[in-house]
């Protein structure tokens, strides 16, 4: 074979497929750009749409924060992309986010990716709209009133204290993140769904925790339900969770009065169904309960793990927490216990600022999803009707001019008379607007109790130093945060 024939063969083998691939990508970009609203004079935001059909989903899933930071550096505070099968505009910055969050029902409406809607189900709060969402949220909010939270305080304190005692006997290395997840799961099962202590065996509890991990790993995936796909695995894990929750619902139906002296969120939903004409069937109750468990333990586990990491790296901050506890009479000796209540917790201003600073630097949920109800004009660009909109929590915190020395862990920034979260949309760990997190007050109380018990019973060392954090979809440490825990003497 002559040289020219070899060159021609090589061109056909390598160059032609490459040209076809580049042409397909270009045609895909043009196809996506054809979704632009011609009646609006503004251009689409800058950005790329990735591969045909797949868009940039695979890049985002594999690289997460690195991918998002690269996009922000290249395109700024608003850019277009293609994620989870939909053309999408990602926005950040207080003003841009304010426009989205205050436009609920008028400019935008909630719409999670198809895989999330399929796995969590149409009956959960985050997938409801308008009046239906308003009424359901009002019912669930009863489970997070101040009186309800007061009932939860001793339950949370009991679980946290027992867990920390086990950590102190765990030896030279304990993987913090899996242990915190199990703790938060037990608390959520008791408080939100009304499971009683020891209702589930350790093996049964571990099976549920693993099922939740599998479901959440595959929550954001391509909407393809075939064996071994992410959506298939997520649905299979969800069905395990639903089976256990159905047992609990049927047990509740057989009882006349709630156990534990308070009504959990699931009990309130069931009573609302029976008394107000909103007929939730068993599937909808299971979906609502699954959503409560997801919101009630995954996000708090992420935040509590970040708290341990930041306090382990900043011993001066931990000492300030202990000094505040000492001033309030909450720093006891190793053999004494001080029962907490809402009044005590509300007095712990610095501890609250430590939690705020943790949520600023490491918000558990990176953002929220909306869909444009009509073509929007935002920051000199158009967002066409029907396109998805993602508002970024983590990026908004990162770029907020309000925060000085943004990368520094400094809880004192929130202690001043004009705290650095005074701008409403610069600090949004719980989202905002009509769709803000329904359980945010529960999360704050839980994290405060966890911080108090941790500070007055434990000292610890992070064995791998500062952790590398990853989003998947909740923020977590890649190495599971190995640490060594020892008892705190009670002396500052």
From Swiss-Prot:
Q: What is its main location?
A: endoplasmic reticulum
Per UniProt, which keywords does this protein have? Endoplasmic reticulum, Heme, Iron, Lipid metabolism, Membrane, Metal-binding, Microsome, Monooxygenase, Oxidoreductase
Endpoints of the signal sequence: none
Q: Which SUPFAM superfamilies match?
A: Cytochrome P450 (SSF48264)
Q: Which GO terms describe its molecular function?
A: all-trans retinoic acid 18-hydroxylase activity; all-trans retinoic acid 4-hydrolase activity; heme binding; iron ion binding; monooxygenase activity; retinoic acid 4-hydroxylase activity
Quote the subcellular location field of this record.
Endoplasmic reticulum membrane; Microsome membrane
Gene Ontology cellular component terms for the protein in this record: endoplasmic reticulum membrane
Instruction: List the induction conditions.
Output: By retinoic acid.
Q: Which PROSITE patterns match?
A: CYTOCHROME_P450
The organism sits in which domain of life? Eukaryota
Cofactor(s) for this protein?
A: heme
Q: Is Electron transport found in the keyword set? A: no
Catalysis performed (reactions)? all-trans-retinoate + reduced [NADPH--hemoprotein reductase] + O2 = all-trans-(4S)-hydroxyretinoate + oxidized [NADPH--hemoprotein reductase] + H2O + H(+); all-trans-(4S)-hydroxyretinoate + reduced [NADPH--hemoprotein reductase] + O2 = all-trans-(4S,16)-dihydroxyretinoate + oxidized [NADPH--hemoprotein reductase] + H2O + H(+); all-trans-retinoate + reduced [NADPH--hemoprotein reductase] + O2 = all-trans-18-hydroxyretinoate + oxidized [NADPH--hemoprotein reductase] + H2O + H(+)
Q: How does it sit in the membrane?
A: Peripheral membrane protein
GO BP annotations listed: central nervous system development; retinoic acid catabolic process
* Entry EC number(s): 1.14.13.-
Binding site residues for heme? 437
Q: Which family does it belong to?
A: Belongs to the cytochrome P450 family.
* UniProt-listed PANTHER family: CYTOCHROME P450 26, CYTOCHROME P450 26A1
What's this protein's function? A cytochrome P450 monooxygenase involved in the metabolism of retinoates (RAs), the active metabolites of vitamin A, and critical signaling molecules in animals. RAs exist as at least four different isomers: all-trans-RA (atRA), 9-cis-RA, 13-cis-RA, and 9,13-dicis-RA, where atRA is considered to be the biologically active isomer, although 9-cis-RA and 13-cis-RA also have activity.
Return the protein name.
Answer: Cytochrome P450 26A1
